[in-house]
């Protein structure tokens, strides 16, 4: 993958919300962190909500990204960005790891964010193990989905959100295999995350103390 945020192939700096979903150890966070590194290198402002801080095969979040670790910090940051009003010349990209913590079914006070925050040039990058744990009003605001290995029920839900049927959700995905879905389009792109970023998926991983 070239280190260009404007790469058509990766859609890294698309001014839309994006969802990365897959069960643990499949590569979703590895891919998200690669995209965050590209955005930081391209001088975009990048925020990250990550309450766990687990290293992936591709390392941690890039230097230059502002890391938030509590829901309180997340919501305060969103309020500040909303108050600033946004600048079309300087979009902000906000990665939300453990997305169900913020956008779960019970988190009704946060559901507005996916609908309205793009109006101030803030674009979400939501990461989740189980798409069905995200509220539908949040999932369906995502124009692109990087779908890695999921349970059949989760795959069916996310494919339905994006207008795809069994021809996609029945696809067998191994570790790192990813399908890129685009809302409103029948086109799909399939690739392997670990081959794309050139890392060993079985490398040791660390959890921050």
Segments predicted by a language model, with ranges:
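A structural signal for isolated positions on well-ordered beta-strands in alpha/beta enzyme cores
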Residues: 47, 123-125, 179
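Conserved C-terminal "switch" segment of AAA+ ATPases
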Residues: 166-175
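Conserved P-loop NTPase motor module
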Residues: 1-22, 31, 40, 44, ...
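Conserved P-loop NTPase motor cores
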Residues: 18-36, 68-166
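Walker A/P-loop NTP-binding active-site region of P-loop NTPases
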Residues: 25-67
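Short secondary-structure boundary/capping segments
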Residues: 10, 136, 170-171
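Flexible, charged surface loops at secondary-structure boundaries
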Residues: 11-14, 40-43, 60-62, 81-90, ...
């Amino acid at each position: 993958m070239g280190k260009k945020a404007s790469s058509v192939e990766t859609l890294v700096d698309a001014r839309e919300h994006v969802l990365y979903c897959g069960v643990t150890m499949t590569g979703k966070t590895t891919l998200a962190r690669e995209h965050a590194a590209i955005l930081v290198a391209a001088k975009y402002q990048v925020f990250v909500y990550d309450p766990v801080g687990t290293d992936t095969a591709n390392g941690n979040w890039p230097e230059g990204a502002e890391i938030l670790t509590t829901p309180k910090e997340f919501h305060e940051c969103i309020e500040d960005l909303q108050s600033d009003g946004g600048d079309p010349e300087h979009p902000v990209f906000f990665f939300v790891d453990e997305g169900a913590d913020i956008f779960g079914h019970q988190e009704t006070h946060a559901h507005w964010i996916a609908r309205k925050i793009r109006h101030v040039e803030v674009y979400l990058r939501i990461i989740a193990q189980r798409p069905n744990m995200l509220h539908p009003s949040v999932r369906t605001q995502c124009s692109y989905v990087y779908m890695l290995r999921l349970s059949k029920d989760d795959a069916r839900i996310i494919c339905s959100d994006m207008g795809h049927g069994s021809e996609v959700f029945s696809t067998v995905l191994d570790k790192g295999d990813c399908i890129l879905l685009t809302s409103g389009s029948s086109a799909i792109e399939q690739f392997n995350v670990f081959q794309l970023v050139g890392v060993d998926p079985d490398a040791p991983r660390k959890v921050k103390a």
